[in-house]
Every structure is written in C-alpha cells, then in structure tokens.
Design a protein with these regions (language model features):
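Extracytoplasmic beta-strand/coil segments of soluble accessory domains associated
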Residues: 85, 147, 164-209, 228-229
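Outer-membrane beta-barrel signature, preferentially recognizing the C-terminal barrel domain
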Residues: 681-794, 841-852, 858-860, 892-894
Length: 987
C-alpha cells in the first residue's frame, strides 16, 4: 500500500473535531469575511537585495529578513537573493539575521529599494534569539534557564544521518535508541522509551500519542526540509507549559511559506551495518513546496519517506539467570518469546517437590516474529496561511499526517506496524497573542505484541496443558510403564532427559491420528484416567517451525486477532482534543512584560479493550490550566526578573500550582556575561496508562489505578492447582479483578525474602519536582562558555511495583485458622504456584533527588575551524530501603563528554564536521529487563560540498564509524554503523 493510498483512505477531519470547533469556525470565518471586506489598500514598498558573507563574499542562503518589530519578512534563496513587498511607507528598518552570524539592521528610505547586506561571522552563538524559555523573544545570553538550539545552518552541518539524530550532540541531551526509526530524547535523568516526562511540541502541537502519552521520536514528526528552528529546554517547565513538562521540552518550528517560498528536494541513501542483520540499504527522500500567492495568502506542502531495516535484537541470555542456557528447563531468553509460559510441574502433577521443578514452553526468537524488521516512515504536512490585513494578524490551518513502522520496547517488544497519526490545527496569531486548537487522532494499524504472538502461535499448535502433559509423560517415564507392554517404545524418549522431553512435547506424537490402536488403547486405559480425562482425544500439531507455511499461517492469524487469549494485535483509535492561548501585554503595559494564557485538553481512549478497560466504549477525561508571567528589567537593563505562576487541574486529581522565579544579571561593558538563578516547581499527571490500562503483558498483568478501572478489569480464567482447589471451593479456575492487585497482594520483595507480607501502597496521584538551577554564560571574543548546575527534589514519584496476587486466601493471613488449616490459604497459593504477578501504578514514599551540571565551550581555532566540547554530570539519590519494591529507573550515565570539530568552508564550497560522544556505563531499570549498559564511544562524521550553479548541497557521512556495536538499553537491537550519501536541492 503506497503512502498516497493511505492518505486517500485515512485523511479526514474527524467528526468529533467538527463538533468541538464548528462554532469557533463559524465565528472565525465571519470575522475573516468582515476583515477582508473592510480591508483597505495599503501602500506597497518593494525591497530586493542580496546577503553575503563579509569574509568570503559567498552568498548566504536561509538568512532571515524581517521588518523590525513585526513578523513580516522573507528569507534568502540558495544564491543569497531575496525579494518581498511591505504594506508600509518608508522609513522603516529591516533586521537581517542567521545563526552563526552577527545580525545587522538596514534603514529603508525609498518605496522601491535594492540593498546589499554583508554579515560578519558571530563571535559566539550567545546573541541568537530564542522564544521558548519565556514565551517571548530574548537572547540566549539573557535566557533565565538553560536552553539549547539548532537551526537550518546546523542541520546542514550535522554529522548525523538526520537532524533529529543530531540532537544527541547537544549538551545535557540523552538520546535512547529504541529502533532505527524511534529515538527517545531525554534530559536530566529518569529516561525510558515511554518517556512521559519529556514533551515534544511540533508547531505548537503536542506530538505525543494519545494512548501511549509519549512521542515516537520523529517517526511522525517533521521533515528536515521544513525545519526552521529547534529549541530544547532541559528540566521542569510546568509554570509555562503545564503538566508533563517535567524533564524537558523539545520545540520544533517549521518554516513559514511567507518567508521561505520555493521548492526544496532531498534524497539520501546508504546502508545500515550490523553483525546480526548484515548490511541493509535504506532510502530517505523528501520534497517541500511553498508559494506566496500574495502578501495576504501563502501555502505549503511537504512530504518525506524513509525505508530501511531495523536493528536486530538477538540477546538470548536467560532473563532471570544470564549464565543459564537453553538446557535450563525453565529457560526464558531475553529476546525469545513464548518461553514465559511456565508451570511448576511438581505442583501440577503432584510429584515430590524438586522432582521436575518449573518448566517453560519452547519460545521463538524475536527475529522470527518481527515480520522482516521493516523500518518505515512517511510524513506529510499541509498548511494554509492567511494575513487579512497588512499587520501581523495571521490565520493558519495546518494538517500533519504520519504513517510508519517501528519497534517499541515497553513491558514487551511491540511491532508498531502501519501506525497512523494525524494532527489538524487551526491557529490565529499575532505579534502579542495566539489562540490555537487541534486534534490528535491515531490508528494503531496492524501493530502487535511480539511476546503474545509467540505465546499464541505455540498455543495454536498445542495447548499449554497438552504441551506440559506431554513433557511430563516423557520426562517421568510414564509412557514406558511395563503395564503398557512397551507400545510407546518407538516414540517415547528415555526418562529424565530434559532435551528429549522438550522435543517430544514440541512434536505431535500423541495426536490421535499419529497413534496406532494399541497406543491409543493404552492412553485411554491408563493415562487419561490418571489425568482426569474422560478419554484421549488430541488434534495437536507439531511446533510450527519459523519459515514454514504452518508458521506463516499461524503468525498471520495471531497478529490479526485482538484477543490476547488467542492473538496479539492491539487496537487503538484514541484521540486528544486540545486548545491553548496566550496574550502578551507588552505593548499595553509599560511597567513590565506581562503575559497570560491557558489550555484545555480532553482525552478519548478507544482501544476496544485491548489496551485500556474501555470495554463499553471510549473513556474520556479532561484537564485544564491557566498561567501568568511577569518579566521586568532593572539597573540599566542588566538585572532581569521573571516570575510565573500556573494552576492546573486534572479530572481525577486535585489541582496543582506551579510557580517559577528567576533572576539574571548581565556583566561587562557589552553585557556579554550573564549570571542566572532560578527556582521552579513542576508536576506530572499520571498518564492514561497509569490510570486506565488493563493489559496482560505475559510476565505480569498491568492494571491502572483509577478507582473505576480497578473493578472493570478481570483476568481470563486462571488454572488452579489440584491442591489449591480445596481452598477455592473445588473450582479448577479463578478470575482475578484489578482491585485485588491493590488490596490483596504480596510485595515481591517479601516473597523473595521468604517472609510473605501484604503489600501496602496507595492509588497513583500526580508527582512533583522542586528544581533549583544556577548558571553562567559568557562570550570572550571568539569563545563562548555556558555552565549550569541543578538540584531536583521529587515528591510522590510515579512508578511501578510488581506484586503477587494469590488465587485464593487473604494476603494479610486474616483468614488463617490453625486448628483447621496447615497454613494460611494465601501462603499455600504461593507454594503451589497459584498466584499471578501484577504491575501496579503508584507513588513512592521514598526520598528521591537528582543533581547534575553541564559545561560547554565553543570557539574558533586555527583560523576558521569550529571546536566545541561539553561535559555533563548526572547523579541521583534514592533511599531503596524505604521502598524496596520500587525501581526508580534513573537510566542515565553519570558522565558524558561530547566533542565537535568542523569547518563550513575548508576550501571554497567544501565543509566537514566530526562529532565524538563518550558515555559512562549505567544501570537500566525497566518493566522489560534490568541490566548494566556498557560505556561507549561513538564517532559521527560528514563531508559536504556546495554547487551553487545547481543550488545543491552534497553530503557523505557515517554514524558510529568506529563500528563497535552498542545499545542504550538492554533488550533492544545493538546499534551498528550507518553510512549515507545525500543530495539536497535548495536546502
């Protein structure tokens, strides 16, 4: 299916979006009509010109030309030329700027004027303007908090395969690679692939999946041709950006068709190289088209497509005991699935304890379950921009559409296949305000859980009970009982041989069609009665061998079935409806720069019961917030005070207040040095999954803690051991409800210690952070220095705990009667394997804090060579003894060093860049696996050449060119090398 076919099939404005904004649209269109009919003809001033480098005389593409104090303007083309009209009579001033160059101003005095501008290379990058730190333009030097930035010039020179990959070279930034197409960005610790503590805003829209509550990297984000700027705020920012702006925010802003018109195209190809996967080609291509029809109307469209092969995950170490091999009867390989299904053979078949122990089914390697490891991403972006007057009022209608395949590692490894997400936005904005509303709508497509794919492929061949019965019969030697007269001699293996017993159970030797009359008679006479069966009746198949027609048929059936008892597909059509607004009183109030704003959001969870407990229809809940900020300068504009206050309320929780206060002071005659200090609080609401998930993940059942969720969730029937049935009213099965995990469970640590105790924890509530930060920025000629240090103190930190729920009995042993019972029923349940692990969502009472620092130096050496180095330190403290069942999951190296070296013009039109990243070892904790991650050094490099006559940039590069494979978390595929060549026209 082509991307454009998908667009035709799936592109629509959801009817629910129409219901929400139809009144706004009617009023807005009326306003537009009135404004249009009431508009007058303004005088037009035509301006043309060129922008060149002062040192080399080379044209500068992508330079920003704006009317000072307004958003009207344009950018230079590949040859440094520009032309635009301004509905304003002279005189007025133009500002010309670009990252890496000192901005300049030019006075326009005539109605038809041509100008020539030269830009000097900036001594440092500290004069660059950012918006995200305070929601208002300000120099990086004066920003009240730490901020990182990237724009088109740095995208051109990045040594990484994509601009998004290049974010890893910024100081303080961690990029955890889930797969080739899914990179998870984080700052300041507590990283996961499901990074709900880090926000990503694309043109003001939260790019998170409604069901997952986190973004999938740039899988469904922005094409690099359309990127104008990327800004990253490390740390808490809840005071301005609300819930979940907890660890940081990434802002991606696209180019305006008013300022960046024309057609741009890129093509990229190369190989990914990995020991497990070999060498595989990838392709990446895109086009951006933008046209300014008039001073009032402009439009753009961009498309990009990437296809490649994922990194193969081939870690076959035993999950619980890494030293054990497949010879272990209870083997559970990390990247092998289906072997999680295991039973205590002694309890089930009433053999003496220690005779057979626990045995697992034979699993399948992940490489056989990922349908070719296809990595794919297709993105489209359409926007209409209308400026009804010659002022700065602008109306934007924007649609972003993405479709892709990737792999996500959560509690299990999920093949995100044919995932589709769309966002539609209507925005009205001006110099001092914006109002926007958007909808995020997703479709899980053909996504499935690889673990349950394996489990149910096994079950489609032979049921669990039949497989374990066959293993027992072979291992115990029951088939070789002399009473059967040796009729099973030709098929039964020698007893006590685990490998032979497993092979016997994987076969279909006891299928009725495979038996002769003597064997079938023996089974009916001796084995069936002993097992409580009325007769022997088997229609099993042998284990399906990967690559066989039987395996393919079973795989296709299981991955298209959304019932986890028989399939592995998960469905999702969840949505987010969001509106937010901001108004800056800067032009109306002289005393200070004051702005106010607010937001409202509604979640509509719709997984048809495959992820959430939405069995009877979508689950809906809302949250809203409002904020105010004041900024004031004192002492000859050297001292800047910023104070912010925000209130947020989520439907299921009490409201939260988030204050932020910061002070910065500029030193030196040219204000080129700046000291800053800030205090702020942040909070994070429990995610949709924290509250409403109801999912059997194989190793554990995940149940969210919303009160109405606890009673909705119920397990499939669970088999009770023969011994346990006397405590379960004689019933052979039991169903557990979600509430049991929170009210009648054992803590895992107590069971592991041999002293089972009832777990004790509360329902999940918002977590909070109090953050302190100090920093110093300075420019010394061609050298810039940026240092910061922070300390974060957390309260009610949200996390998971694993508890064990007994099939019968009370976990506090209150039902124990010593005179009639040998032991408490719940304790007997533990001894017989009659329990189920649950993962619950709660808050830790432990004291948790983190602290760290970053230092970055950038300068010019040997003339025009750029050199940069930065160091990041990160550490956390957690009182594990106060909460032994809690895993904090800091998942961040204590030390990181990053170095860059390059030159954009080594000789005429030739440039290069090299990035080196070193990361210390660290411990990774997650619901999938806990393990150490080794230290690593990664080298990326690129060489580029510009051909002005063709308006083209050619690049050749490589990522991890050292070739030593590594991973950022255990369980994922090891990252090999990636080599590429690219051709960009009109970048």
């Amino acid at each position: 299916m082509t991307f454009f076919t998908i667009i035709r099939k799936k592109l629509y404005f959801a009817s629910t979006l129409t219901n929400i904004i139809k009144d706004i649209m009617k009023k807005l269109l009326s306003i537009i009509f009135v404004l249009f009919m009431g508009s007058v003809m303004f005088a037009q001033t035509s301006i043309t010109g060129t922008v060149k480098e002062a040192k080399t005389g080379e044209p500068i593409p992508g330079a920003n030309i704006k009317v000072l104090g307004k958003s009207i303007g344009t950018t230079t083309d590949f040859d440094g030329n520009f032309s635009f009209k301004v509905a304003q009579n002279p005189p007025f001033t133009l500002e010309i700027s670009l990252i890496g160059y000192a901005s300049t101003k030019v006075e326009i005095t005539k109605s038809d004027q041509r100008i020539s501008v030269v830009l000097d290379e900036a001594a440092t990058a500290l004069d660059e303007v950012v918006v995200s730190a305070s929601r208002t333009p300000e120099r990086i030097l004066e920003s009240p908090v730490t901020i990182e930035r990237m724009d088109v010039r740095e995208i051109k020179n990045t040594s990484s395969p994509t601009f998004y990959d290049g974010l890893e070279n910024l100081k303080g930034v961690d990029v955890n690679t889930n797969s080739l197409t899914f990179k998870s960005i984080n700052t300041r610790g507590f990283a996961t692939f499901a990074n709900t503590r880090f926000m990503q805003l694309v043109d003001g829209m939260d790019n998170s999946s409604p069901a997952l509550n986190f973004n999938l990297g740039n899988l469904l984000g922005m094409s690099e041709l359309d990127v104008s700027t990327v800004e990253l705020l490390p740390g808490a920012s809840s005071a301005l950006y609300g819930a979940n702006a907890f660890n940081g925010i990434l802002f991606m802003t696209s180019k305006s068709p008013f300022e960046s018109a024309g057609v741009s195209v890129y093509g990229k190809t190369g190989i990914t190289s990995q020991k497990a996967a070999g060498d595989n080609q990838f392709v990446d291509a895109g086009i951006r088209m933008a046209y300014k029809f008039s001073d009032k109307f402009a439009a753009k469209a961009s498309f990009s497509y990437m296809k490649g092969t994922e990194w193969y995950a081939t870690d076959y170490e035993d999950y619980e005991n890494p030293g054990l091999t497949r010879a272990n009867p209870n083997y559970d390989g990390l990247n092998i699935y289906g072997d999680e299904v295991s039973i205590n053979m002694d309890a089930t078949f009433r053999t003496p304890a220690g005779t057979l122990g626990t045995v697992s089914r034979t699993g399948y390697n992940e490489v056989d379950l990922m349908d070719g490891y296809n990595a794919e991403s297709a993105k489209a972006d359409f926007a209409l921009h209308y400026r009804p007057f010659a002022n700065d009022l602008e109306i934007v209608l924007n649609s972003k559409i993405g479709n892709g395949n990737t792999i996500y590692q959560g509690a299990n490894r999920y093949n995100i296949n044919n995932f589709f997400m769309q966002q539609h936005k209507l925005e009205i904005k001006g110099n001092n305000f914006f109002v926007r509303g958007y909808i995020t709508d997703e479709d899980a497509g053909d996504s499935y859980d690889s673990r349950f794919a394996a489990i149910n492929i096994n079950r489609s061949a032979k049921s669990d009970s039949n497989w374990f019965t066959d293993y027992f019969l072979a291992m115990s030697g029951a088939l070789l009982n002399p009473a059967f007269g040796g009729v099973f001699g030709p098929i039964a293996p020698a007893p006590g041989n685990h490998t032979a017993a497993r092979a016997f159970a994987d076969g279909n030797f006891l299928n009725n069609a495979s038996l002769n009359p003597f064997q079938l008679g023996a089974l009916n006479a001796g084995i069936a009665p002993a097992l409580g069966l009325p007769s022997w009746n088997r229609t099993d198949a042998a284990r399906y061998v990967p690559g066989s027609e039987g395996f393919k048929a079973a795989f296709d059936k299981v991955t298209s079935d959304a019932n986890l008892a028989t399939g592995s597909k998960f469905q999702d059509a969840s949505k987010i409806y969001h509106t937010d607004a901001n108004y800056n009183f800067g032009d109306a109030i002289d005393f200070a720069d004051i702005q106010v704003g607010g937001s409202w959001r509604q979640y509509s969870l719709n997984s048809s019961g495959t992820i959430f407990t939405d069995y009877d229809g979508p689950i809906k809940y809302e949250e809203y917030g409002a904020y105010m900020q004041m900024q004031k300068k004192f002492v000859d504009d050297r001292l800047k005070f910023t104070g912010s206050l925000r209130y947020d309320k989520a439907q299921n929780f009490d409201g939260n207040v988030s204050p932020r206060v910061s002070l910065s002071y500029s030193l030196g005659e040219g204000k080129t040095r700046n000291l800053r200090a800030s205090f702020q609080t942040g909070f994070r609401n429990p995610t949709t999954q924290d509250q409403y998930i109801g999912l059997d993940a194989g190793r554990a059942i995940l149940v969210g803690s919303a009160p109405d969720n606890l009673d909705r969730y119920s397990t499939n029937p669970l088999t009770v051991s023969p011994t346990g049935r006397m405590f379960n009213g004689g019933a052979s099965t039991v169903e557990l409800v979600g509430r049991a995990a929170y009210e009648n469970s054992f803590s895992l640590s107590s069971v592991m210690a041999g002293a089972p105790a009832k777990s004790n924890f509360g329902l999940v509530k918002p977590e909070k952070v109090t953050a302190y930060e100090v920093g110093y920025r300075a420019g010394f000629g061609r050298l810039s220095l940026d240092m910061s240090a922070y300390y974060n103190q957390y309260e009610d930190f949200i996390g998971n705990k694993t508890v064990l729920v007994p099939y019968y009995g009370k976990a506090d042993f209150s039902d124990f009667n010593p005179s009639t019972m040998p032991a408490p029923p719940a304790a007997i349940a533990l001894s017989q394997g009659d329990y189920k692990p649950f993962q619950v969502y709660t808050n830790s009472p432990a004291d948790i804090s983190s602290y760290g620092a970053t230092v970055g130096v950038d300068t010019k050496v040997m003339g025009n060579y750029s050199f940069g180095v930065n160091y990041t330190y990160a550490k956390f403290e957690f009182d594990q003894d106060s909460d032994p069942d809690y895993e904090a999951g800091f998942n961040t190296p204590e030390h990181k060093i990053k170095v860059s070296f390059g030159n954009t013009d080594v000789i005429e039109n030739l440039g290069f860049n090299v990035n080196v990243r070193w990361s210390d070892e660290y411990f990774w904790e997650s619901t999938f696996v806990n393990a150490m991650v080794d230290a690593r050094t990664v080298v990326d490099a690129q060489v580029n050449y510009t051909v002005h006559k063709w308006k083209s940039l050619f690049k050749i590069g490589g990522a991890n060119i050292g070739g030593k494979e590594y991973y950022s978390a255990p369980g994922v595929g090891k990252i090999g090398s990636q080599y590429f060549v690219s051709w960009t026209i009109n970048p």
